[in-house]
Amino acid sequence: MMDKRPERDFTAKVCQPIWMEGEARNGKKHGVLLLHGFTGTIAHLRPVADALHKQGFTVMGPNLPGHGTTMDEMAACTWQDWLEAAKAAFIKLQKCCDDVSVAGLSMGGCLALLLAEQMHPTAIAPVSAPMGTRLPLWLATLTRPIFPTIWWKTRDGQMRPVMNEYDYGYPGFRNKCGWQLSRIIKMSRRNLHAVTCPVLVVQSHADETITADSADVILRGVSSGRKGVLWLQDAPHVCTITDEAERIAAAIGEHFRWAETHRE
């Protein structure tokens, strides 16, 4: 039987898709596509979006298919749906901006890596991007009859607190979605060598969701001439809604501006 716990209400303004027009620098505009994570919403990237917009970037942040609605709607979506939505948003930004860079949180970071391979952005910044997870996703098919829904654990109280006004996402996911996430992780990891644009990885030493070597796997795998990492100390997986948000946005903005002026 499907668990019918109450679902979240996603009508809050912070959950709505982001579009903020930026300023031209030397006659050119730089667009930033923000991609949220698995079961999350664009609200998780709202503080970073606001900070990047203040830096002059045009910022776009969609809610990926099946997110910000119901867990059952999400269960009807595939990893291809999420990748195609990310591509469509990227193309929309390309039509009005001279440069387009991508920053993604968690699964959104994996999508950023796939876009780097296929769409050739100016730069990317994967944040808390999993190259492996602490969840046994490979068990999804076997355990589905017993556990049709997987519920997220309560955050560790030892970590930095999150800003609750931006913490909008599903409390869990239908088990069948686990395979879709594992597929995106596998696809993004398989062709890291095809990523040549500048890469800034953001990861917390305290991340409770992804494998600790994820940042190292990305940095070793990509072929980028410029690549680096911003390490956070005690931030949770969704670090973009903690008091580290400004620091993250500052580092990402500086990274994107560097790429803008050094693009071949």
What is each PLM-predicted segment?
Residues 233-264:
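Catalytic active-site module of serine/aspartate enzymes centered on a nucleophile-bearing elbow/loop
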Residues 195, 201-203, 207:
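Short beta-strand/loop motif that positions the catalytic acidic residue
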Residues 104-108, 112:
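Gly/Ala-rich beta-loop-alpha elbow adjacent to hydrolase catalytic centers
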Residues 48, 197, 211-220, 231:
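Short alpha-helix in the alpha/beta-hydrolase fold that links the catalytic acid
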